[in-house]
Amino acid sequence: MEYVPKILVDADACPVKAEIKQVAEQFQLEVIFVASFNHYSVNTNGENWIFVDTGKESADMRMMNIANKGDIIVTQDIGLASILLAKGTYVFSNRGELYREEEMSLMLDIRYRHAKERQQGKYSKGPKAMSDQDRSLFKDRITTFLQNK
């Protein structure tokens, strides 16, 4: 029997949950949202949510434990992305960029340098707010990926 991938979402700060649900429904894929108890809600609308301790990296650890080769991951966390890519998953950013293993070293280095700059008091702007166009682009990219898989 062929493995049917699931979509795992690093849900604490994910701005495209609605788009993920739409794509999952279209392709009949299971979605699992993983978030800390800080984001707990009794109103999950029948969705599959896993809530974890509020400790640093708790959601990441849970995602690493339940991810399987071939699963689709949505996260902004480059460190988590690099680990899950090594497990044979497909990792997308919240903006629909498909991370590639050969890019991870450079991306992790840039993240490290930015963290050092922040420690020195140099603050950079955060990411721009998600627009409707960004949401549409995310949905288009993940849909195209699944159609070609």
From Swiss-Prot:
Record-linked Pfam families: DUF188
Coiled coil, from the record: none
HAMAP family: UPF0178 (MF_00489)
Family: Belongs to the UPF0178 family.
Protein name stated in the entry: UPF0178 protein lwe1471
Organism: Listeria welshimeri serovar 6b (strain ATCC 35897 / DSM 20650 / CCUG 15529 / CIP 8149 / NCTC 11857 / SLCC 5334 / V8)
Highest classification ranks of the organism: Bacteria, Bacillati, Bacillota, Bacilli, Bacillales
